[in-house]
């Protein structure tokens, strides 16, 4: 399992490549008292999420307050669908949309092309 090493390497890269002060990694679950103290959250293995109704409510509140969620570590269509269904519970009024290669966000620091995206079936 890559946790917590992958998380730590990811946040170290953010610190190294941007002007964002990341601070020390802080691992916790949704609902932990520290949850709303972080404006940016990196969640891994969300294809295994089984969020309770309370966790769904808290994640919704977090996002609607302006919190930023980055997710990672999907293995195939089944895990993607688990995450998608979870997010439908969190934000039922919103749809997920794919970010195209031409979107400016794909070219802020690096030029990310479709060929660079990693998808594991």
Which residues does each predicted region cover?
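Aromatic-Pro/Gly-enriched surface loop or interdomain linker
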Residues: 1-40, 44-48
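Extracytoplasmic/secreted proteins, especially bacterial periplasmic and envelope-associated proteins
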Residues: 5-13, 54, 58, 78, ...
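Sec-exported extracytoplasmic/periplasmic mature domains
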Residues: 15-19, 64, 88-92
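Surface-exposed patches in mature extracellular/periplasmic domains of secreted proteins
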Residues: 20-30, 71-76, 94-102
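Generic preference for flexible, low-structure residues
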Residues: 26, 30, 57-59, 85, ...
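Short alpha-beta junction capping motif
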Residues: 40-80
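An acidic, glycine-rich "communication" segment
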Residues: 78-121
């Amino acid at each position: 399992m890559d946790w917590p090493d992958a998380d730590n390497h990811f946040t170290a890269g953010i610190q190294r490549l941007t002007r964002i002060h990341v601070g020390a990694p802080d691992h916790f679950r949704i609902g932990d008292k520290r949850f709303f103290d972080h404006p940016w959250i990196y969640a891994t293995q969300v294809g295994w999420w089984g969020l309770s109704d309370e966790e769904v409510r808290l994640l919704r509140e977090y996002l609607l307050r302006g919190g930023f969620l980055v997710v990672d570590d999907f293995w195939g269509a089944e895990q993607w669908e688990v995450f998608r269904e979870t997010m439908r519970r969190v934000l039922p009024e919103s749809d997920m949309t794919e970010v195209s290669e031409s979107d400016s966000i794909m070219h802020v620091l690096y030029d990310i092309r479709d060929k660079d995206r990693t998808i594991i079936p």
